Amino acid sequence: MYKRQVQHTEPDHSGGFKKVYAKYPNAKVYASISGKKNMIEQYFDQVPYQVVKTNDTINTGKYDFVFVEMQMIHWPDNMLTYCPQLKTVFSNDAFGQHIVNFNLTDEGLDKAYCLKQAKEYFANIVLPYTTPVQAKLNLILGMNLDIEYIMPAHGIIWKDYIADIIETYKGIAAQKVENKAVIVYESVWKHTQQIAENLAEGFSDAGMDVKVYKLSDTKSSIVMREIMDAKVVCIGSGTYNNVMAPSVAAFLEHIRPCKFKNKKGLAFAAYGWFNQVAKEIDTRMQQSGIESCHDVINQCYTPSDDQLEDYFNVAKEIAKKCQE
């Protein structure tokens, strides 16, 4: 009998199931309990499903496949599979990236580039689930698997940099931070931009690595990657019809499920007659786990030289707090 594994039921993973089913209608389908439910909801209920859980093994005649449930990395149905004969981990979404390489593996690719791409993927797909990632990573490492290849569902196959990607995952799953400040903002008349630029100068003067992004000019995936390991996050907006800029509101919604740890935050805004936007930004930053470390900055119209110096010093003060 033919056997099929369904590691994940999101359509980019399972979308070809109908074609496979048409050719092998009697093949048994192995899936997690959530995977079975999702497959029935999306495709067929008459398929011979078999639910598997961690450490269950199937044999295809030539190969054994050991299953590991990977709930909430990043759906409830996710599974990882290990083949001892091939010394290969089929890791599903874990360890994924969006790298295209004709050699299929990481051979010949710059290590820093590969890890950077993996971080960007993690930040935008898996970041809200660092706690289960950490738990499952410890479980898998505790199984002492002999691994020569890690084959994620997205991107290149890990071969040369397996130890490096595992160490990278350990760090980001533990939400380790670097001595870095990330400032994101939206501005039309440059009032908010001036605040951002002077904060950046203050952080830099205090010895921190600084990244500054205007949201309308930057892919949010890049901003997410940089925020992931930042010690300080500053978010600012101009005031538009008594609310924050739509790009800032969307970004705050993007980070809300992340539940960050080990991050200090500062909210800032420019306004003309309604000065509540910075407070709203601060509230939403705290909802994402970013701890407020200074009073919000409210700037009425154009900042003076003295005010810009104040913002420079605010950044230095925050940087100092982060070293204590």
Cite the ranges covered by each PLM segment.
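Metal-dependent catalytic neighborhoods of phosphoester/phosphodiester hydrolases
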Residues: 15-23
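Short, charged N-terminal beta->alpha structural module
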Residues: 184-205
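Short, small-residue-biased leader/transition segments that mark boundaries at the very start
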Residues: 1-2
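Short internal beta-strands
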Residues: 6, 26-34
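FMN-binding flavodoxin-like domain, especially the glycine-rich phosphate-binding loop
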Residues: 101-104, 110-150, 154-157, 176, ...
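Residue-level marker for buried hydrophobic side chains located in beta-strands
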Residues: 5, 88-90, 151
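Divalent metal-coordination and catalytic microenvironments
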Residues: 8-10, 81, 93, 133, ...
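Catalytic core of the metallo-beta-lactamase
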Residues: 44-108
